[in-house]
Regions:
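Short linear interaction motif-like sites in intrinsically disordered regions of transcription factors
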Residues: 2, 20, 103-105
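Detector for Asparagine
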Residues: 15-18, 22, 62, 86-88, ...
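Conserved active-site-adjacent core of cysteine acyl-enzyme catalytic domains
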Residues: 65-134, 140-142, 147-149
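Polar low-complexity intrinsically disordered regions enriched in Ser/Thr and small residues
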Residues: 27-28, 90, 157, 163
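Acidic, Ala/Val/Gly-enriched low-complexity intrinsically disordered segments
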Residues: 2-4, 11, 137
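N-terminal hydrophobic targeting segments
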Residues: 14, 124-126, 162
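Active-site signature of cysteine proteases
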Residues: 134-135, 139-170
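Active-site nucleophile-adjacent alpha helix/oxyanion-hole segment immediately C-terminal to the catalytic cysteine
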Residues: 6, 10-74, 95, 100
Length: 170
């Protein structure tokens, strides 16, 4: 039974033309195992920046955030360490992306309900970074680039996305 489920899941992923396996250069940078580094991966893929460069930049941004604030998030960063390996707060990665020339485009408001899903026909073309529930993912011309298919069969809600105004017409 388990093998049958695994086979069906693998077959579903293999047949999804809207998904491409992409670790953003994580393996090439020498990292192994699993990690909650979706922010690093998504930024590396969408900006075409080496994984290690993004990792180091976010680590530095985490350190600056933790050192310059007295919030719960800053204290949590200090206590768990500044590594972006196991997640990043939006308060850190959004200014990082904005410093690279990227802009935020919300796709829903509080209490509004989902209007845009993680589907090619509902997203702009070009390179974007979509914010989902507890996840960031790079989408390149409608193709989800990630270590797993996070589309939920096109039903996953997109809260908004980052885009580079100089690259595309969003």
């Amino acid at each position: 039974m388990e093998l049958e489920l695994l086979t069906k899941k693998t077959e579903k992923i293999m047949n999804n033309e809207n998904y491409k396996y992409n670790d953003g250069g994580r393996a090439d940078a020498g990292y192994k195992g699993k990690a909650g580094d979706c922010v690093v991966r998504a930024i590396a893929i969408a900006t075409e920046t080496p994984y290690q460069e993004v990792y180091d930049g976010l680590k530095e941004a985490n350190q600056e955030y933790a050192d310059s604030r007295r919030t719960r998030k800053a204290k949590k960063i200090k206590s768990k360490g500044t590594t972006p390996r196991n997640g990043n707060y939006r308060d850190v990665y959004q200014p990082y992306l904005e410093s690279k020339g990227w802009s935020w485009k919300p796709t829903m408001k509080i209490g509004q309900g989902c209007k845009v899903h993680l589907k090619a026909d509902e997203l702009p073309s070009g390179k974007i970074i979509c914010r989902l529930s507890r996840h960031l993912v790079a989408v390149v011309d409608g193709i989800v680039n990630d270590t797993y298919d996070s589309t939920r069969d096109g039903k996953r809600c997109v809260y908004g996305y980052f885009y580079n105004p100089s690259q595309a017409s969003n």
